[in-house]
From Swiss-Prot:
Organism: Trigonostigma heteromorpha
SUBUNIT field: N-product is active as a multimer.
Transmembrane segments: none
Role according to the record: Intercellular signal essential for a variety of patterning events during development. Signal produced by the notochord that induces somite patterning, dorso-ventral patterning of the brain and early patterning of the developing eyes. Displays floor plate-inducing activity. Binds to the patched (PTC) receptor, which functions in association with smoothened (SMO), to activate the transcription of target genes. In the absence of SHH, PTC represses the constitutive signaling activity of SMO.
Record localization: Secreted; Cell membrane
Taxonomic placement: Eukaryota, Metazoa, Chordata, Craniata, Vertebrata
Protein name: Sonic hedgehog protein
Top-level taxonomic group: Eukaryota
Presence of keyword Ribosomal protein: no
Family per similarity comment: Belongs to the hedgehog family.
Length: 121
């Protein structure tokens, strides 16, 4: 005990690269489609809120910090009910998230994607 693991080198994801390398709505990536979760459904209560102060949530209804000091993770879309996605979108189930960084530097997106994969998203 007491041994510190060396951090592994993170390889940025390429634009439009998926982990696993299949489309997000396939059975292997996201499981069986179980229907849209609406605000009034019982399953809505199963969604877990995230109150992490290091994440800026875009308010459409009115681990990044360690990689880029002073930069925060910006969630632009998570669970959604507005109907702007495809019928079986994972956003309606609370199983998809769109993210950027607070500085909106697109050169960081590949590494940001890799960090999300490493975090289990």
């Amino acid at each position: 005990y007491g041994k510190r693991r060396h951090p592994k080198k993170l390889t940025p994801l390429a634009y439009k690269q998926f982990i696993p390398n299949v489309a997000e709505k396939t059975l292997g990536a996201s499981g069986r489609y179980e229907g849209k979760i609406t605000r009034n459904s019982e399953r809505f209560k199963e969604l877990t809120p995230n109150y992490n102060p290091d994440i800026i949530f875009k308010d459409e209804e009115n681990t990044v910090m360690n990689q880029w000091p002073g930069v925060k993770l910006r969630v632009t879309e998570g669970w959604d009910e507005d109907g702007h996605h495809l019928e079986e979108s994972l956003h309606y189930k609370g199983r998809a998230v769109d993210i950027t960084t607070s500085d909106r530097d697109k050169s960081k997106y590949g590494t940001l994607s890799r960090l999300a994969v490493e975090a289990g998203f």
